[in-house]
Amino acid sequence: TIVVARSKSCSVKTLHSILRMNVICLQRGLPNNIVYVNDDPYEKNEMIQNHMKTADRIIFIDFGVCLDDDTIKQCLEPHEGVGCLVFPGVKEGVDWNLFKEGVEKGSKEPIHQMGLHFDTEVSNKISENIYNVTNTNARAWMMNTKNVIKAQSKHKDKKLSNKLFDKL
């Protein structure tokens, strides 16, 4: 697990997520190595590259991000054949016009999500709670390193894509 820190400090929300993840890992008998990285895009990229060589799976949690138990459990599922899972997060602020529009139209969207914009766009559904991602700036994600390395070798690309680097 790679956790982003600022001024050598971890957000309380993020720390709570890490503690919950450790409890779930202990219950399942799974090892979980936690490393901290400064909130610098170059350092994050280097940390990810280094751990791709040694870890089966990387779980990346940006500063201030909180993962609920269901998300943590998704991180620990096998997800055979999947390279990465991203966990959409809410962008700051409420779009009250969008909220009003949803209420007036009788939207089936959960009321607690109306008027919110997310950092990830999805397309077709793959399975329960799993969708193809069309665009993302996710601040929490999971990578099956072997699948990603295999895909990189097919494309003869040994480094992380510049697109990913720009988003960090």
Task: Locate each region found by the language model.
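Broad hydrophobic/π-residue packing in well-ordered secondary structure
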Residues: 26, 30, 54-57, 71, ...
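N-terminal anchoring/stem segment of glycosyltransferases
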Residues: 1-54
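Conserved beta-strand segments of the P-loop GTPase G domain that flank and frequently precede/overlap
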Residues: 3-5, 62, 86-87
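Residue-level marker for beta-strand->alpha-helix junctions and adjacent short loops that shape enzyme
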Residues: 7-9, 65-66, 91-92
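Acidic donor-binding loop at a coil-to-helix junction in glycosyltransferase catalytic cores
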Residues: 158-166
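Amphipathic coiled-coil/heptad-repeat helices and related helical stalk/stem segments
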Residues: 43-44, 68-71, 161
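Conserved catalytic core of nucleotide-sugar-dependent glycosyltransferases
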Residues: 68-157
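Short beta-strand-to-loop acidic/aromatic patch adjacent to the donor-nucleotide binding site
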Residues: 55-66
